[in-house]
Regions:
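Conserved donor-binding/catalytic core segment of Leloir-type glycosyltransferases
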Residues: 14, 54-71, 77-84, 90
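Short alpha-helical donor nucleotide-sugar binding micro-motif in glycosyltransferases
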Residues: 125-131
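Short hydrophobic beta-strand element within catalytic cores of glycosyltransferases
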Residues: 147, 156-159
Length: 232
């Protein structure tokens, strides 16, 4: 009911994802302004990250996420374990929660490593840039910052198949709905042959739609329309 109250009692609505905009229109018959979250193409990498975390460039799979059920961590972990992948799977996110501890315990004797929360952007960008694959399991919540930040770092992203993610990545981006879907993708012998092409396409999307200067300009124009009492 909070959603309904907020939508129906707001003078102006901003949707950060096309799928959210469509949802509001279909369910409430109300128009909203689409303005997404922003990101910048990565240019600075942390020289010490590789040594600090003992990672090897291009020799790991990565996820950065809140450890919550809707982010499909178990699905991705189970898919990884059922695949033939031998490189480690690193998960960055706070595991000092009930669900985080459950995951850490469940996968403690595997090649899945929970690194905890990392807040240094250069370190996070270094992980994203050097990851072999980046698995994005978020299934709710519009445009997720972790996804566009991974795209901005030229990570080879594989996304959960839902309207929120699919409206952000390039049209032929790889996606999964089930454990078996993802396991099959991980086992494709030629999967890395698509890395440069798809990563570059997603980076072009960032630079054409999600750069912060573009986002800020959209907000400025929207606020000026509001101040000018123009119909929106």
């Amino acid at each position: 009911w909070l959603e309904k109250f907020g939508v129906r009692n707001s003078n102006y609505l901003v949707a950060d994802n096309i799928a959210i905009q469509e949802y509001i229109k279909i369910n409430y018959g109300i128009n909203s302004e689409f303005i997404a979250y922003g990101a910048e193409e990565v240019s600075d990498l942390s020289r010490n990250t590789i040594e600090k975390y003992l990672i090897e460039k291009g020799e790991f799979i990565l996820t950065i996420a809140r450890l919550e059920p809707e982010n499909n961590l178990e699905l991705m972990c189970d898919a990884y374990l059922s695949s033939n992948s031998e490189i480690p799977y690193y998960i960055i996110g706070n595991y000092q929660t009930k669900y985080g501890q459950l995951l850490k315990s469940k996968y403690k004797d595997t090649n899945i490593h929970f690194l905890g929360a990392i807040f240094n952007k250069e370190e996070l960008d270094t992980f994203r840039f050097y990851a072999n694959l980046y698995l994005h399991g978020h299934s709710v919540g519009g445009t997720n910052p972790a996804l566009i930040e991974a795209m901005a770092a030229k990570a080879f992203v594989i996304v959960h198949n839902n309207p929120f993610n699919k409206s952000v990545v390039c049209e032929d981006n790889l996606s999964f709905s089930t454990k078996d879907d993802l396991s099959e993708i991980l086992d494709r012998p030629n999967i890395l042959s698509k890395r440069e092409e798809l990563s570059q396409k997603n980076l072009e999307i960032i630079n054409s739609k999600y750069r912060w200067d573009i986002i800020i300009e959209k907000y400025e124009k929207y606020f000026l329309k509001i101040l000018g009492n123009k119909k929106i």
